[in-house]
Amino acid sequence: RRNSGSSLVSSSSASSNLSHLEEDSWILWGRIVNEWDDVRKKKEKQVKELVRKGIPHHFRAIVWQLLCNAQSMTIKDQYSELLKMTSPCEKLIRRDIARTYPEHNFFKEKDSLGQEVLFNVMKAYSLVDREVGYCQGSAFIVGLLLMQMPEEEAFCVFVKLMQDYRLRELFKPSMAEL
């Protein structure tokens, strides 16, 4: 005979343990973010391990920016100026926007905020890196960033990924790295 009372207790206990783990994770990641300069230098291995285990959604945007040092970029100040310029890639970017995460609520509606900010970031990048310009596949990276952070921050992280982490090699017109 099954004791339904004990299964309720164990379920409740498991739920309580999970919420404590989540709370501990929030406290830990909050401390990491607040003490980033010290933590980055003194506990690099532990940070790598924690990142591999997963960054809580609430901290993802700031941690991704910290990990790639995007906040130190002067390019962020140029972003609004880049948006005022014309890119030779604009027509191509507009054509492809609807193909980027077409089922995701943020991007699926024509001329939605999601499509607008995706266009903005892709256009700005095409002006910063004229050799790469625009490549449709890169919009999926930017789209993922935009799901986590505002467009200026997404732009800075994308520039860092492309330049410092050599993703731009994958998107050069020759695509030699593929």
Q: Where on the chain are the PLM-derived regions?
A:
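N-terminal transition regions in large eukaryotic proteins
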Residues: R1-S126, L146, R168
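Hydrophobic (often cysteine-bearing) scaffold residues that line and stabilize catalytic clefts
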Residues: G114, L118, S138, A154
